[in-house]
A protein has these predicted regions:
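Short beta-strand element of the alpha/beta-hydrolase
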Residues: 28-36
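Short beta-strand/loop motif that positions the catalytic acidic residue
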Residues: 235-237
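Alpha/beta-hydrolase-fold enzymes
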Residues: 111-198
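Conserved alpha/beta-hydrolase
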Residues: 43-72
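N-terminal cap/lid segment of alpha/beta-hydrolase-fold proteins
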Residues: 1-25
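Active-site glycine-rich loops that stabilize anionic/oxyanionic intermediates
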Residues: 35-39, 239-240
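Alpha/beta-hydrolase active-site loop
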Residues: 77-96
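Catalytic active-site module of serine/aspartate enzymes centered on a nucleophile-bearing elbow/loop
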Residues: 258-300
Length: 300
């Protein structure tokens, strides 16, 4: 399996770290992994290698404000999620070129905004650890974060605001061992996340506001209707993931996708699994279900 790593200078001269794993067999398609908030692409090494062994080329990149070799003053901040998906599109175009292979994304809210913005560019969507924001829940959160941004400044990383977010995610976990327990029921993964200097950092008020805003935006039927209706969607989550409202939010989001006219929507929910379901205990079974879904739609 060949691997290529490089930096791509995007439209506004920001450098984006990119890694590509090429399969050793005839490629079934290209899978682009979008990492989550306050983490980085290297955490997905094992998953990328496994996907390559199953016949897919795999792209990863670090979103602006994230990664290893970046200006520390930028860590945990970006102004606009639309610029972030613009970066991802430039990465995809650079690697994909004119190759006529299916293009599939694994991600969460950034992936959801991407497929809304470039509906005809994407052939498949895998949402892991995502959630559904109804108006009654999402709008007050967005308004509060918008106010905090105005009071403290968009680039400010406010400790108590970040703490408030993690506390809300940990409220059902007893006993609580660490502030990162909500991400996984696997203590080893939690400890690795905490020890990683490039994960778990505080993020800016603007990044939190943008995340909440677009979580709400991409949960609305009118915005989902613009998606490519032929694009199959797989939602993967744990019943103990607070972001997915302990399974209920995932099922609601799937129903909205179906109501919008998406032809193939599947939900894989797993008992006793938390937010980072792909890194959970016994994740081999979860990965196997993922490979089966991919093979159903994408063949050589």
């Amino acid at each position: 399996m060949a691997e290529k790593q490089f930096k791509l200078t995007v439209q506004d001269n920001t450098n984006i770290e990119v890694k590509v794993n090429f399969t050793d067999v005839d490629s079934k398609g290209i899978i682009h992994i979008f990492h989550g908030m306050a983490e980085h692409m290297e955490r997905y090494d094992k998953l990328a290698h496994a996907l390559s062994k199953h016949g897919f080329d795999v792209i990863r990149h670090n979103h602006r404000g994230h990664g290893i070799n970046i200006d520390e003053s930028t860590r945990g901040h970006y102004d606009d999620m639309k610029r972030v998906i613009g970066d991802a599109f430039e990465v995809a175009q650079t690697v994909r070129g004119n190759v006529d292979k299916p293009y599939i994304i694994i991600g969460s809210v950034i992936a959801r905004l991407f497929v809304e913005t470039y509906p005809q560019y994407v052939d498949g969507l895998i949402l892991s650890g995502t959630g559904m924001y109804p108006l009654w829940k999402g709008l007050p959160t967005v308004k509060v974060l918008q106010l905090i941004t105005k009071i403290y400044g968009s680039e400010k990383r406010v400790e108590w605001v970040n703490q408030l977010v993690s506390n809300s995610f940990n409220k059902k976990i007893r006993p609580l061992r660490t502030q990162s327990d909500w991400i996984s029921s696997n203590p080893t993964e939690v400890d690795n996340f905490i020890k990683d200097p490039y994960s778990g950092f505080n993020v800016s008020n603007q990044l939190l506001y943008q995340t909440a805003y677009y979580m709400l935006h991409t949960s609305q039927l009118k915005n989902i209707k613009v998606l490519n209706h032929a694009m199959p969607i797989l939602l993967v989550s744990g019943y103990d993931d607070p972001l997915g409202d302990y399974g209920k939010g995932i099922l609601k989001l799937a129903n909205i996708y179906r109501k919008a006219g998406i032809k193939n929507v599947k939900v894989n929910l797993y008992h006793h699994k938390r937010h980072e379901v792909l890194f959970e205990k016994d994740h081999d079974k979860i990965w196997e279900d993922l490979f089966k879904w991919l093979n159903q739609f994408y063949k050589k």
